[in-house]
Amino acid sequence: AKRELLNVFLTIPKDRILIVDPMGEYAPLVRRLGGQVIEIAPGSPSHINPMDIQLDLDDDESPLSMKADFLLSLCELVVGGKDGLQPIEKTVIDRCVRLIYRDMALGLETAKTPLLQDLYEELLKQPEPEARRVATALELYCTGSLNLFNHPTNVDLTARVVCIVLKGLGENLRKIAMHITNDFVTSAVNVNFHNGISTWCYFDERSEEHTS
């Protein structure tokens, strides 16, 4: 796969390359190619904000609805349990997501990309006890010891080659990291497609070219 990656890099200069690297095996090559290596781990200086959103895409599906769906799935992972989120919990999460993105959706100049903590704080404002249950589960990832996803994005996600390293994560945190990584990859592929750019995605030694 590394040989194919290098071949794509050298022969198809317009294409983008995205790598999800569980063991950090691709990181040295990506650095040599001048790409962006992002190490997702507690204490890492690199951060991807799961609340990032691309609102200006001319797509069939609303970016806000897609982000709400992603955050519902994220909260489901965080809350856990065999039954997942209950209908009322899904309703209050969806409501809060739309509230915290309201300024961005309206195109206000003062609008800022929210953080996970903004969702947490909005949940605490809701009257339903179910909202507090979800907020309590999120607390660990906002103000607790696993707050690595509660930061603004500080890496170049638009680099031609991006390698996300998931080495050193526990099982639960790895599931959340993979969910956030998959959301980034899906979003990047969509943006690239709209710009007429093909994307090569590498997961666990398997590659797939996205051209649509």
Predicted regions span which residues?
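Glycine-rich phosphate-binding loop of nucleotide-binding enzymes
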Residues: 1-42
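P-loop NTPase motor domains
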Residues: 27-35, 42-44, 49-208, 212
